[in-house]
């Protein structure tokens, strides 16, 4: 629809409302580009190769356009579209373009080889890159840091049990462990054989694979391997040689059951793009062409987004609920309710229809937190509610309630409050999907090389602020609950104050770092009752 103009509003707000009205999806949400990481398309294409299902021409051309357009001047590709070149991404993108039909003598591919070969090529890639190459038969499994499935057989009380990891981390290493144990590998083709010859600076047959396990280029060593991790890798390597066959099979059964639970709970969407592809490959290896594979293949396109720079794989199946909740709050802040009523009604319907209404079946067996009443980042079908998404869904609903447009029944709004409360950590803050389960020292065992703070779901200022704001809004809406929520709000406020830096800033983790942190830090304190002359707010304002 086209929003009629109003001379009462500043032109910037006018244009903003017009854009929101014009870009709303028929289902009531706003869909946007959630791309950026450059290693996702290579993982997608690798998955297609392992499935034996090449990309259709339109998908192929879209991927090529995206990858070609983001090559750095030095010939490499970054971890994301704005980063310096990484061996991890550069090798994977090279392989991907070759799989998509680009010849080895292509000028861009020649520049890529000229960059990554002197940096060590696959032997110096971050660990995830080596793993994907191993799946394609372009890297030996002997050169991988072990990913044994037997970790899932450890007593659940131990901090090293995978259930203690941040859910994104454990859901990636879950299928990795199955594929590693099975030494899954794509069918050899002349093209793969040719690529294998192109990406190494030395003959493939002469590589010292055991030495390559701990080799990482400086470009990829964002989180350098600690002595603890190296010791753990050594112990796991020993276990890999000694693991009894019966124990391995039992562990693989446990892992496959956990994969099944994740697939069913997310309608085969999966929590994120990496485990989406890897889970698909697991089932193709376990039951080729079976119903699990077909169910996964149908949802693979959920992760694709076509933009001005080409076709990309997003970091989530969408960001719809998050974007819609903020769009609603932004529209309501203008006061133009009547003018935007049809837009708000559709958005209210989307918010209502995407609240999670029930817990995951046998959630304890799948190591899942409660879900009932929460909102996800994207869609209800995705099945993973998040603390701040629940908070923003609740805030948007309560603001819609004030203008008579909310469609979420009051009992379900209260369930959202209960979901938020269930996620408050002992330190008073809120993490993302779950309570903090493992100790922070687990980060010393981070095996990814290219990512940090992935091992444990810790409290963040953004999540904490959003939850404090939502609880404060509910207290105003339902005064009878104000006493019940007073202590959780105060604990959240204390956490926000504790993590403020000496210069008055907050370090954000889920947006544009300090700008994002300052926005949420100040908003959380104000919602908790801080006055304009509060020292923390004055420091945040630079006064």
State where each predicted segment sits.
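Preference for long, amphipathic alpha-helical scaffolds in soluble/luminal domains
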Residues: 1-543
């Amino acid at each position: 629809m086209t929003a009629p103009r109003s001379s009462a509003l500043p032109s910037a707000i006018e244009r903003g409302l017009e854009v929101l009205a014009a870009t709303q999806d028929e289902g009531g949400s706003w869909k946007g580009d959630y791309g950026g990481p450059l290693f996702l398309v290579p993982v997608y294409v690798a998955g297609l190769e392992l499935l034996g299902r090449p990309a259709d021409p339109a998908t192929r051309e879209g991927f090529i356009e995206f990858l070609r357009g983001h090559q750095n001047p030095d010939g490499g590709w970054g971890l994301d579209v704005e980063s310096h070149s990484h061996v991890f991404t550069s090798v994977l993108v090279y392989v991907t373009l070759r799989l998509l039909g680009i010849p080895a003598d292509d000028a861009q591919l020649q520049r890529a080889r000229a960059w990554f070969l002197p940096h060590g090529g696959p032997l110096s890639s971050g660990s995830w890159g080596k793993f994907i190459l191993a799946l394609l038969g372009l890297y030996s499994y002997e050169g991988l840091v072990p990913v044994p499935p037997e970790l899932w057989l450890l007593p659940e009380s131990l901090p090293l049990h995978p259930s203690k990891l941040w859910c994104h981390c454990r859901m990636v290493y879950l299928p990795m462990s199955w594929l590693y144990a099975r030494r899954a590998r794509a069918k050899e083709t002349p093209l793969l054989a040719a690529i294998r010859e192109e990406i190494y600076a030395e003959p493939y047959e002469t590589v010292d694979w055991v030495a390559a396990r701990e080799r990482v280029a400086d470009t990829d060593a964002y989180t350098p391997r600690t002595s603890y991790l190296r010791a753990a890798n050594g112990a796991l390597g020993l276990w890999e040689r000694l693991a009894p066959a019966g124990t391995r099979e039992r562990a693989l059964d446990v892992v496959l059951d956990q994969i099944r639970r994740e697939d069913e709970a997310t309608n085969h969407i999966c929590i994120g793009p990496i485990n989406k592809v890897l889970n698909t490959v697991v089932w193709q290896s376990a039951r080729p062409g079976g119903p699990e594979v077909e169910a996964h293949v149908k949802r693979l396109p959920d992760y694709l987004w076509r933009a001005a720079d080409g076709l990309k794989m997003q970091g989530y199946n969408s960001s719809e609920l998050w974007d819609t909740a903020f769009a609603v709050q932004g529209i309501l802040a203008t006061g133009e309710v009547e003018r935007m009523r049809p837009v708000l009604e559709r958005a209210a319907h989307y918010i209502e229809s995407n609240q999670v209404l029930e817990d995951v079946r046998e959630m304890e067996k799948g190591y899942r937190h409660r879900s009932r009443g929460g909102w996800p980042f994207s869609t209800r079908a995705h099945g993973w509610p998040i603390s701040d998404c629940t908070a923003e869904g609740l805030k948007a609903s309560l603001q819609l309630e004030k203008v008579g447009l909310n469609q979420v029944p009051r009992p379900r709004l209260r369930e959202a409050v209960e979901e938020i409360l269930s996620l408050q950590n002992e330190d008073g803050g809120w993490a993302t999907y779950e309570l903090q389960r493992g100790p922070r020292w687990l980060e010393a065992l981070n095996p990814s090389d290219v990512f940090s703070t992935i091992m444990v779901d810790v409290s963040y200022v953004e999540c904490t602020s959003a939850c404090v704001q939502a609880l404060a809004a509910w207290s105003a809406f339902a005064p009878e609950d104000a006493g019940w929520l007073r202590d959780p709000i105060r604990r959240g406020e204390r956490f926000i104050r504790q993590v403020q830096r000496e210069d008055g800033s907050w370090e954000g983790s889920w947006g544009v770092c300090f700008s994002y942190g300052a926005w949420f830090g100040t908003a959380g304190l104000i919602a908790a009752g801080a006055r304009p002359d509060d020292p923390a707010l004055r420091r945040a304002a630079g006064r």
